[in-house]
Amino acid sequence: MGESFRIRPLDPERDRPLLGRLWEAALGSVWPLPPGALDLVKEGLVAERGAGGRHRGSGPGDADRADREVGVVAVDPAGSIPLLVVDPAYQRRGVGTRLLEAGMARLGQFGATTVALGSGGSDYIWPGVPDNLPGAVEFFRARGWGFDHTVIDLVADLRGYEAPAGVGERAGRAGVSIEVMAGPERAEVMAFEAATFPDWVGWFERLDSSVLVARDRAGAVAGTLLFRGPLGATIYEPLLGPDAGTIGCVGVAAPARGAGVGSAMVARASELLRDAGTRACHIGWTRRERFYTRLGYAPWRRYHMARRMAPG
């Protein structure tokens, strides 16, 4: 018989050192630990080696407990598994499978009907399973997860950034203006998001980013995006370097598409971030690689996306 493991609830505060240790051991060579990533882990389960003994609190047994804790699965009650990590010394011994099964069951108890890998809840570390973790991709595929598409992150060095020549001309000829949202416009912008891009409403409600607003000739909102930087903008700063920024939730209303509005907004946001002192700018979770490369961004990371029904 193989070694036994018990599963216990994750304590996000007390288990933070455990998360950091497992991350560094299993992922650190490819993904240097983003400290902000650990802040996103609020619910989950821990695998402990050996079935004996009940769980203890802080005290003399902490060192022994750390030696026994070999894996963690994080869950977001809204319906995602943001992270599953197992000590390399205990991989291929059933720990990951046990954690995945327990995490899926826990999400079913929370009332989730479908579960996504990576994103799908209120926040995420990665949109999906990183392409540069091929062992993780194969782990989930071997357990029946079907990856149906791939998304991409892109980056650009904004120091000295110059928008492509003529990028705003078509939008200008169509009478489109692009400005940073002022406070009194907020209700109108939120109504636009709710009607046009409802999946993004939560990101706009956070109030942690600036909003760029495109308006048509009649003054109606035609497009929006979020931009933030250079301070505290992204959990990927350990990889991107200091003074990183982000652009996200780039959306244009259907009647305004094809007029260069999206391109003009991204270029303008890039200029504003450049002028604010942003170095690397990160654009995450998109399938529109050609759109962003034409604006000076280059592919950075790819993620495989999967979703399946939660257990009843």
Model-identified regions with their sequence ranges:
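Acyl-donor-binding surface of acyltransferase catalytic domains
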Residues: 101-174, 306-308
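A structural microfeature
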Residues: 71, 149-152, 222-223, 301
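Conserved hydrophobic beta-strand within the GNAT/NAT acetyltransferase core sheet
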Residues: 81, 115-117, 247, 281-284
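Short amphipathic alpha-helix that is part of the acyltransferase structural core
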Residues: 1-35, 46, 68-69, 151, ...
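Conserved acetyl-CoA-binding loop-helix of GNAT-fold acetyltransferases
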Residues: 92-109, 249-252, 258-271, 275, ...
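A conserved beta-strand-loop-helix scaffold within acyl/acetyltransferase catalytic domains
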Residues: 26-45, 67, 71-79, 197-252
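A short, internal acetyl-CoA/4′-phosphopantetheine-binding micro-motif in the GNAT/acyltransferase core
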Residues: 81-91, 120-123, 247-257
